[in-house]
Every structure is written in C-alpha cells, then in structure tokens.
C-alpha cells in the first residue's frame, strides 16, 4: 500500500502544524540526541521516510484493533467518532445547496431522493455483515473526504478549500447581481402567460395575432444614460442622474479584472491543480463503481416505466445557429423547389439592376439539374480542421456569397422571405417530432441601431413562433472588421448599437412594439467568433470603450464584461417592469486561450463547447461544484478542433458535470433531417452510452434551456425528477445529488468554524498522550497503547468520550515534542 492510500485513513485536524527544522537520520537512536546531532545543511520540514512509516504504524494498529474489537473480519465498525451513515445526516446537508447557481438546483436531496438512497449499492463504507452503504450523510462519512489525509497537509488543504470557496463566492456575486439565477426570471413565475399558448405537436398555424399582444407604456420616471465607463446606467429620475446615483450597482471593470486575476492565479496554483485533479479522478472512479453495481438495477427501473423511452422524452438543442438550422439535403431541396416554382422572382440587386432567381443561376452557369450536395459544398470535411476561416466559407452555397444573401439572410432585398419559409419548414419538422425543442442563435452585429427593429419585424411579420423554439441573440466579435471598414469609430458605438434599443423598449415598449413582443421569446445573449485568434496586449491598462479606437479587436474578457455589465443593468430594470430577463451563454473553451473559461465562469450562466476545460482541472472542478451548464457538440469539434475520440464529453459526463448534447451547425455537420437525434446516436455508438445515459443527457438539456419553468415542470415533473416523464431512474438522480452534496459539503466545511480541537486543546491531548504512555516516544510505547486505548482511559478518567483522539495523533505528538525540544535547544544556545 502506498503512502497516499494509508493517508486516506487518517482524519485531518484543523490545527496549526509547525514544520521541523532538522532531518532525522537514525530513527532507532534516542531522538533528543538525533535532533541535536542532525546537520543544519539538511534542514527540512519532513521526517525521515522510515521513521515516519514507523510512526504511522501506530495508526494502522489503531484501525486494525478498532475493527476487530467491534466488527468482523477486520472491517471497521461504527464508532463514536465516526457517526453511522443515515438518512438523517443527509437531511442536514441542505445548507450546502445555496452554493449552486445553476438551473434546476434547488434542494439537491429531496424526500424522494433520500428514500431511494438506501438502494444505491456503493460499498465504500463497510457496515457490519451487510458491507453496503445505506446512505451517505456528509463529508465525515464520504470515502473521498480529504479530511482523512495526513495532518501535515491540513494547512495547505485549508488554503485550497478557501480558494475554491472564494472563487465560488465571486461567481455567485456576479450571477446574483445580473439576475441569472434559477428563479430570478419572471417567466419562471406561475403567473407568466405564454403567448401563443400551444402544446408541442399541435398545429400552431394562425394562432399568433400581433393585434392580441398587449403593449404597455411608460410606468415611472426611470431614465437611462451611458456612463463614462461604457455601461448603460438606470436612474430613478433626472435628479438622480444629475446627482450621479444609479439605481443598480454594476461591478466595475476594475473589480472584474481583480477577481479574474485571483481566479487565474488560483487555477494555476500547483497544489490547487493537484487537488482538483485528484478530486475529479475520485469522482470518475466513484461513477465507475456505481455503474458496476447498479447498471442492471437502472435497466430494470426503466423497463417498469410505460410509454417512455429515449425517443419520447423531451430534449432541447441548446446550441444551434439559425443560419445553419437545416441540413444540406433540406436546403438543396428548398433551392431546387424555388428555382422550379418561381424562377422569375426578383431576388437581389446587382450591377445596377434587380436580378431574378433564374438570372442569378445563369450567371453562375448552373441549372437545377446541376445542383447536388457536392455542388453546394457546405459540409465541413477534413479541410476545415483548425481552419476556422475555411469553415466560415462553408456558409456560402456553391461558394457564392450571393446565394447566402438570398437564401440564408434575414436582411436582404426580399426581406428574408426565403429564410423565413425555410425556418417554417424546420418548425414543422419539430412540431411533427413533438419531443424535440431548439434554441436558435440569430445575429445582431452592432453595426447600427436599426438591426433590432429589422430582426423583430422579420420574426413578427413572418409569424415565426413555435412552442418548440426559443431564441438567443449572438453578437459576433467583429469590431476590428467594422473599424477597418469605417462603419464605427470606437468600441462604444458597438455597445450602444447592441444595447440602446433594448433600453428604449424597456422604458416605453410603444416605441418598438414588435421588438417588445419578440423579446418575450428571447432568452439570452451569446458571444461568437473564432476563439483561436491571438489577443495582443496593446495596453498596460485597458481603456474604456469610448477610448478604444484602434483597429485591433478587444480581448475576449473585455467583450464579455461589457456584454455582461449592460445586460445586468437591463435585467434589473426589466424585472422591475415585470418583463423577462436574459442570461449570458457565450461560446467558450472551443479553442484559444484557457483564460476565456475564467471570464465565463465569473460572468455567464452557461457556455457552449467547453472542451478546453480538460486542460484546467481547477476550473473543471469549479464547473462541477456549481453545475454550470455546458452544451457540447462533439461532431462540430471533430470537424474543427478536436478528434471525436479525444473529446472530453464522456469524461465530463462520468464526473458529473452538467453537460448536454447539441448540434451547433446542422448545415455543416448533419446528414439527416433530425440532427439532434443524429448527435445522440453517434455519441451513443462511440461512447457506448446506455439508454439511461441518453435520457439523463436529455433531461440535462431541458434544465439548461431557457424555456419557462411551467413547461419544464410539464416535461420533467414538478421537481424535475419524475421517472414517468424523464425515464431517468431515481437511483441515478439520487447518486448524482448525493455525490454533489458531499463535494459541496467538503468545501463548505472548511470555511465554517472548525469543530476540531483548538491548538490549546491539542496541546493538552498531546501531553495526556505522553503521560499515559509513560514515555514521550510513541515507538517505545506498548503495541496496545494506541489512540483507542488513550481515548478509553481518558473516558474513565474524566467521564467524557474524547472523540478528538484520532488516527495520526502520534505523528502530531512527535512533531509538537520536537518543536518544543528545538525551542529549548535554541534557548540554551542563546543563554
């Protein structure tokens, strides 16, 4: 057995340990002489290896004797210092649930899960003859509890725990201020009215009527103005604006970068990385053990559920771009149909005149017969790997930008009619499938203020409403392109163009009525572009947006902050007015710098891709603890940045991260008319996912999505744990909640007042230990004079059970004795 395995059996002590300054070379000699004789050139805080092993042998005796006294076959039994695992202790873990800010967090272990815990077979803690855990209460009984490590490392562990807790507190601060929490959005209230209200699978044609939409007016005197930092601030009235007192507190960019620097320092700290890596390895190993023991039980549970299987549980495509919503075959069939039915329709202005659709294809020297999948050439093959520039060209049918303008743009000479018709066909497919939902990303570029009104008019006029669909607004990070083209002068103009119309419509929806109605189906913002672009640090201190007038693009962290800050101010105002709020779900961790993940951890509700988390174990562990949503697209990554077999999706899933599957760009990556099912099918074949695994991923996608809470309850059950609706066995949900609860408790326990003995109490225990053994040398003590014997003697002596005696006391006793010896030796030298 190696040292680490032995350490796992020794509970830690929350007490200061003072490193030794001498190296023991002969553990068999008198130790007072050894300390005095040790050469000063070999100063070290550690014992000699053999000597330390002999010290720890005392603890091994304690564990063995404790097991043989009360249990069978040497298995440890319940003791006063190690409370038995029970459901009552599980209920005491509710205080850790506040640490979660992700969707569907709430109470991790409700009554349903607690009642099911006893059926989970996890023989990590042996109990008598059964040798099976009935339930797990907290970190004291968690087999992976780091408290059981050597007391020598308790101080270092405490610092790591505090660092983790501080990072989580920073995230919670930003999420709380921006109203991105689970129940912060008014749409999650039971009184929220969904219009048009139509169940999935029902024909929604003609249900939407813009005249039936209520458009409120101005409600109060609140005003908005952009401050000198580039943030739209909301004021109670003009007097508050003159006084410079905004209604809502927005974290400053200085505070943000200070917090970001701390997070980056913590993530690069060696001990923190090692600790996080070990915890993640433990979580993965625990999952493997769980599956070995419970796989067939899960299968039996799912077979008892009538009507439900993977195909008819709700699943949401949480990351898909609207301009690539249809696969190649669908787009090809649509283009051929238009060329056949309306060839003489004027579609584009070129060379001083309008061209018909037939004239456009004549100029390309193509006929309907010539068109094929290969001719379109929109699928991302091997030539796009690590070539994001080539991938962007795949959005052009036949390599022609004019065809993209005609068929895949909302703002063109035909007002985006072709794209609207294609979108309706996809909506029809979703309605037919009934159990599939999608959240489409649609672009606002920030080039001018009219973009919002044009987009809203396109949605409303074409009646693009579906009970299966919600929208996100993606903002491409293309300031450098706009600057070089002369479209904008400073970065502040981009920020103003993106957010000012939203503040206008929040103040008075009558100024942009169509935009007001459209925003009710918008759930958040996304930040998109090639993350692998180099980010040059041109300033020692970043200027405010009004002073950012160079041709270089701001870094990712800068972009994300100004999207977050303005969205935070907007959300606060919209919630006061009773309007829906937004979340930030950017593309992050697909390529480029891992620092992007730190920015997203602080500011965003969830991310897309996240494959670079595999390189930063500390951040990955934080992602697990806070259950931050990750929408992963292995097929997309396989074509662009990472081979499918190297994708960390399966590892994330095993460890318990909140992951879901999404399609990203069906036009470039999918071959079938059901791209989401295709994504699941490939993952199931490559990773050998079970039906329960896929149903759990589908459930995760619903929880990650921005659909209204009343819809989620209809799809998943009131507490999101109804096996009759999710087809996920309660035993699986109980395992996930149980493991997460213990990990959170492990961190929280070390930032609360310690229940372990103080330094003064520890001194008394050590002196009593020395006195009762009759010698200050643990090696010369009787084999039966161990921690258990000491504890029993003290109980007889003063009538109390001293649960503070623990395996490892001999080591601490030796360290304290040596410290005292060295102190007295130093004093003698001075005298």
Swiss-Prot record:
Zn(2+) binds at residues 319, 321, 587, 664. It is an enzyme of class 3 (hydrolase). The active site is at residue 609. Keywords: Cytoplasm, Hydrolase, Metal-binding, Nucleotide metabolism, Phosphoprotein, Zinc. Pathway: Purine metabolism; IMP biosynthesis via salvage pathway; IMP from AMP: step 1/1. The modification Phosphoserine is found at residues 79, 84, 758, 776, 780, 782. It comes from the Eukaryota. One of its GO terms (cellular component) is cytosol. AMP deaminase plays a critical role in energy metabolism. Homotetramer. This is AMP deaminase. It comes from Schizosaccharomyces pombe (strain 972 / ATCC 24843) (Fission yeast). The lineage of its organism: Eukaryota, Fungi, Dikarya, Ascomycota, Taphrinomycotina.
């Amino acid at each position: 057995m190696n040292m680490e395995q032995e350490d796992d059996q020794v509970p830690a002590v929350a007490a200061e340990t003072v490193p030794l300054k001498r190296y023991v070379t002969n553990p068999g000699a008198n130790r007072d002489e050894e300390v005095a004789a040790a050469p000063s050139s070999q100063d070290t805080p550690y014992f000699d290896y053999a000597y330390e092993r002999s010290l720890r042998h005392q603890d091994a005796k304690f564990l063995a004797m404790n097991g043989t006294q009360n249990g069978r076959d040497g298995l440890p039994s319940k003791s006063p210092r190690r409370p038995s695992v029970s459901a009552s202790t599980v209920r005491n873990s509710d205080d850790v649930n506040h640490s979660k800010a992700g969707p569907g967090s709430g109470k991790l272990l409700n009554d349903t899960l607690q009642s099911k815990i006893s059926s989970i077979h996890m023989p990590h803690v042996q109990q008598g003859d059964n040798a099976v855990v009935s339930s797990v209460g907290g970190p004291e009984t968690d087999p992976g509890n780091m408290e059981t490590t050597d007391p020598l490392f308790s101080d270092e562990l405490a610092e790591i725990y505090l660092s983790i807790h501080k990072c989580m507190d920073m995230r919670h601060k930003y999420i709380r201020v921006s109203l991105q929490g689970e129940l912060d959005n008014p749409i999650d209230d039971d009184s929220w009215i969904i219009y048009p209200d139509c169940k999935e699978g029902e024909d929604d044609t003609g249900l939407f009527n813009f005249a039936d939409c209520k458009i409120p007016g101005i409600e109060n005197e609140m005003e908005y103005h952009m401050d000198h930092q580039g943030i739209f601030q909301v004021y109670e009235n003009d007097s508050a604006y003159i006084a410079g007192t905004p209604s809502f507190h927005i974290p400053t960019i200085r505070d943000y970068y200070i917090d970001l620097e701390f997070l980056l320092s913590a993530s690069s700290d060696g001990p923190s990385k090692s600790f996080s890596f070990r915890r993640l390895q433990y979580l993965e190993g625990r999952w493997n053990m769980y599956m070995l023991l419970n796989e067939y039980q899960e299968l039996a549970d799912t077979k008892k559920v009538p009507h439900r299987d993977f195909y008819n549980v709700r699943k949401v495509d949480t990351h898909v771009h609207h301009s690539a919503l249809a696969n190649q075959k669908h787009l090809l069939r649509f283009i051929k149909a238009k060329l056949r039915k309306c060839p003489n329709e004027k579609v584009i202005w070129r060379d001083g005149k309008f061209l018909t659709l037939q004239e456009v294809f004549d100029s390309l020297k193509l006929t309907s017969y010539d068109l094929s999948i290969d001719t379109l050439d929109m699928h991302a093959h091997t030539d796009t790997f690590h070539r994001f520039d080539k991938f962007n060209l795949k959005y052009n049918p036949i390599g022609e930008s004019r065809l993209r303008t005609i068929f895949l743009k909302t703002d063109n000479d035909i007002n985006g009619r072709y794209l609207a018709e294609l979108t309706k066909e996809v909506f029809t497919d979703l309605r037919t499938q009934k159990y599939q939902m999608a959240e489409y990303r649609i672009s606002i570029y920030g080039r001018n203020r009219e973009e919002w009104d044009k987009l809203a008019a396109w949605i409303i006029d074409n009646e693009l409403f579906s009970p299966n669909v919600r929208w996100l607004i993606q903002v491409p990070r293309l300031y450098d392109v706009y600057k070089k083209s002369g479209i904008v002068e400073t970065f502040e103009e981009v920020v103003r163009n993106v957010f000012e119309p939203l503040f206008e419509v929040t103040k008075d929806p009558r100024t942009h009525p169509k935009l007001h109605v459209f925003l009710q189906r918008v759930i958040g913002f996304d930040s998109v572009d090639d993350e692998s672009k180099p980010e040059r640090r041109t300033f020692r201190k970043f200027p405010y947006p009004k002073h950012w007038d160079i041709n270089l693009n701001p870094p990712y962290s800068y972009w994300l902050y100004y999207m977050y800050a303005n969205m935070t101010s907007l959300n606060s105002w919209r919630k006061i007015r009773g309007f829906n709020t937004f979340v930030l779900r950017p593309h992050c961790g697909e390529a480029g710098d891992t620092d992007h993940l730190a920015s997203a951890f602080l500011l965003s509700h969830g991310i897309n891709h996240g494959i670079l988390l595999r390189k930063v174990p500390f951040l990955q562990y934080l992602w697990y603890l806070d259950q931050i949503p990750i929408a992963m697209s292995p097929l997309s990554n396989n074509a662009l940045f990472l081979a499918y077999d190297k994708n960390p999706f399966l590892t994330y899933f095993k460890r318990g991260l909140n992951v879901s599957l999404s399609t990203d760009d069906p036009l470039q990556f999918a071959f079938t008319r059901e791209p989401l099912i295709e994504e699941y099918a490939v993952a199931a074949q490559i990773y050998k996912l079970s039906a329960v695994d896929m149903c759990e991923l589908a459930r995760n996608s619903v929880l990650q999505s921005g659909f209204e809470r009343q819809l989620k309850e209809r799809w998943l059950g009131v507490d999101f744990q109804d096996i009759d609706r999710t087809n996920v066995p309660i035993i699986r949900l109980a395992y996930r909640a149980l493991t997460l609860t213990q990990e959170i408790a492990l961190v929280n326990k070390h930032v609360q007042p310690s229940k372990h003995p103080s330094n003064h109490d520890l001194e008394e225990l050590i002196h009593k230990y020395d006195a009762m053994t009759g010698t200050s040398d643990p090696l010369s003590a009787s084999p039966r004079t161990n921690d258990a014997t000491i504890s029993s003697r003290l109980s007889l002596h003063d009538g109390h059970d001293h649960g503070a005696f623990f395996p490892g006391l001999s080591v601490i006793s030796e360290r304290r004795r040596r410290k005292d010896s060295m102190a007295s030796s130093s004093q003698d030298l001075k005298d």
